[in-house]
UniProtKB/Swiss-Prot annotation:
Gene3D superfamilies to which the protein is assigned, alphabetical: Helical scaffold and wing domains of SecA (1.10.3060.10), P-loop containing nucleotide triphosphate hydrolases (3.40.50.300), SecA, preprotein cross-linking domain (3.90.1440.10)
Family matches, as PANTHER family: CHLOROPLAST PROTEIN-TRANSPORTING ATPASE, SECA INNER MEMBRANE COMPONENT OF SEC PROTEIN SECRETION SYSTEM
Subunit annotation: Monomer and homodimer. Part of the essential Sec protein translocation apparatus which comprises SecA, SecYEG and auxiliary proteins SecDF-YajC and YidC.
Protein name, as recorded: Protein translocase subunit SecA
Gene that specifies this protein: secA
Gene Ontology process terms (BP): intracellular protein transmembrane transport; protein import; protein targeting; protein transport by the Sec complex
Cofactor note: May bind 1 zinc ion per subunit.
GO MF term set: ATP binding; metal ion binding; protein-exporting ATPase activity
Keywords tagged on the record: ATP-binding, Cell inner membrane, Cell membrane, Cytoplasm, Membrane, Metal-binding, Nucleotide-binding, Protein transport, Translocase, Translocation, Transport, Zinc
GO cellular component: cell envelope Sec protein transport complex; cytosol; plasma membrane
Compartments in which it is found: Cell inner membrane; Cytoplasm
Keyword Transport: yes
EC annotation from Swiss-Prot or TrEMBL: 7.4.2.8
Cofactor names: Zn(2+)
Amino acid sequence: MISGLLKKIFGSRNDRLIKQYSQNVKRINALEPAMQALSDEQLRAKTDEFRQRHANGESLDDLLPEAFAVVREAGQRALGMRHFDVQMIGGMVLHDGKIAEMRTGEGKTLVGTLPAYLNAISGKGVHVITVNDYLATRDSDWMGRLHRFLGLTVGVNLSQMDHEAKQAAYAADITYGTNNEFGFDYLRDNMVYTAGERVQRSLNFAIVDEVDSILIDEARTPLIISGQAEDHTDLYLRMKDVVPNLTRAMEEKDEGDYWVDEKGHQVHLSETGYEHAEQLLAEYGLLKEGTSLYDAANITLMHHLNAALRGMTLFHKDQHYVVQNGEVVIVDEFTGRLMAGRRWSDGLHQAVEAKEGVQIQAENQTLASITFQNYFRMYNKLAGMTGTADTEAYEFHQIYGLETVVIPTHRPMVRKDMNDLVYKTADEKHAAIIADIKDCAKRGQPVLVGTTSIEASELLSGLLDKESLPHQVLNAKQHAREAEIVVQAGRPGMVTIATNMAGRGTDIVLGGNIEKQLAAIRDDESLPVEEREQKAAAMKAEWQEVHNAVLASGGLHIIGSERHESRRIDNQLRGRAGRQGDAGSSRFYLSLDDPLLRIFAGERLRAIMDKLKMPEGEAIEHPLVTRSLESAQRKVEARNFDIRKQLLEYDDVSNDQRKVIYQQRNELLETDDISETITAMRQSVIAETFRTYVPAESVEEQWDMEGLERALASDLQIIAPVAQWFKDEPTLSDEEILERITKNADEAYQAKIDLVGDGTFHQFERNVMLQSLDSHWREHLAALDHLRQGIHLRGYAQKNPKQEYKREAFELFEGLLDLVRREVTRVVFTVQIRTPEDVEETAPHAEVQNVQYQHAGYDEALGEGEGAEAAGQQPADAGPKIGRNDPCPCGSGKKYKHCHGKLS
């Protein structure tokens, strides 16, 4: 009550903002006569003048009044369209990084030209984002005329464009494109192997058209790039034959080709083992004569040999996995349950498949993924336009930090929004809709019928056919054709049935749109100029008559065939009528069979109808019914908001990690010499290995010098006679020993550089680092995905799933960084680089096939929800408890206590 009183005295925040912006509009209007007096060349020269002034320290805010006045005049000259005062306010709202809610028909597309021009002056690029390729192309051509008139460059970013065309589009001052394409380009740019392959510049300023659709409706579905890893089936099969020919040593000191470290779950080849393996691989035609497993070109062979050895010696059938229906299925080592659908990484699963003689499946990996929330929050400044944002203002503020400002209409709104009519059955509702359409058609009033599904639109179309009523059906599939039809939906007596989103972004002009016909007359050079003007004038006069007739019939009539889950979508449908002060009306027809009513209010309304003994075909019409429906919609909207917020909270964890990995990649691509990074990695890995065998602040009796020497040689290929040093000089401190090992490693590293020269070796290091980062990041994405799918079950253990996810994801990430450090150090020391050609062999290349771009379903991408209502439920996979003497569920035939029971 008090807040309402204060609002009356001081006005709402929205009113105060509009008042402030209106002061600026007065300044812009005062500049209009001066702009009108300029020639085209002088007007165009203003762009360079603004750039110079901005470079000299003037802010974009200082330039705003003059720049907006220039755009208004250019709009008049290039497009024949003058920006209204309310459109100027909309432009300022967008420039301030807010959301402008403007009614349908108020010229949002034209409003976007104002902040786009002003922000393009900085030279950092502006992205104008729309919902489909058709609108991106249309707006870049249409509004591009204004920008090009003022000397700016305009690009359009479409799917299926080649690399050069994309780079050119992003290099332009203003780039139009779709949300999906901008997001995928960002992901692709973080998968390239040279800086020159990237297409995007820094993310400076984005203007999102239909911002509610992009930032809210599509925010539940992440963008995913996935693909099949390179097919090495043949290699796995041949490696399977190589491994049995190698002999196993029981202990590390014993003779043999390899020994198995069961504690560390690794297999290590001895020096004789490497030689024997090289000989066998040469016999099988896998290794070229005169080459070594240590050569740069043979890193893949080394990887496959290691996978085959591990698969053969460390993973046993009916203990670690079972073979079922021709597939290798992992057995959970703690529960003994089968883990269908899970696969080991690093080629291990394929090695086991080769061992068991089943079909080897190519790994389908997620290569990169991001949500729209996290992509758009990376822009330095974000703004949006829509006809309906006020209902979601809270979400825009919570998730994106964006304020919503409702822009006043240019002319007062006179559309008549009638109360909903609720019928008992769907058949009664459909009969009432047909009767309403018939009545409108008789009076020559155009009708737009909005449906929530293609099925519903086809049903109504069939009923209209039975009544022999001419009509057109639009389902959101062919955007370009739809736009043409929607434009003409305002002709007298025209009946159009459309799904809610069909033809969005295109205005319905009462009397039809004659712009195309007028353009054809103006461009017809076979006619004299005078005759062209006469023809155009006659066409306009004819259109005015039709326009007036439609207004007299009541303007466009909107019929909603059912309420949508979101009030915003209903408001969008209503907003198709009553544009720019035109007459119009809207009415929703509902039945108790509609999903929303059935779930939230059906029983109560049905009871009322039964009590009133309402005859068939009669409807309930009352503001109370409309209000209760809006309350039901609010509940659904709140639930959907919670789902999106939850997705974001989970994705924020991987987003922080994504930023770290992508930043490292970018530094690698932009730095010529990464030897400092490699040195820091090497020293960190050596120190960690050293402290494993020589703990800090420990006595000499606890030091394992022989173990340290072996670990340095086998894990890092660093040869340091540590045991001998200590024997010769017993007084050596642990710090001195570490210093010597580091010095030895530094000398060995420098010797490798001296062999081929700085440039060649540093390029090799970069290649190794990129490959390692990319492959481990892909595996990490899969691990996070698996973690997220099962994390909700932690709720049953009275743990917070979100906190658990954050903690475990952090541990996984630390493990990833450690793996990369160790792998890069080992490969740099192991691989022998003799010529620049060897470096070419190590160059990373896209090891994936059948790359797919998905805007995947939320449930598919997220797995199950967090399971907040955990108390009264059972875990999805909870089976009966296994007794110690029961057969083990892995299928081995042993008792549980002698099989997987040992592990738990």
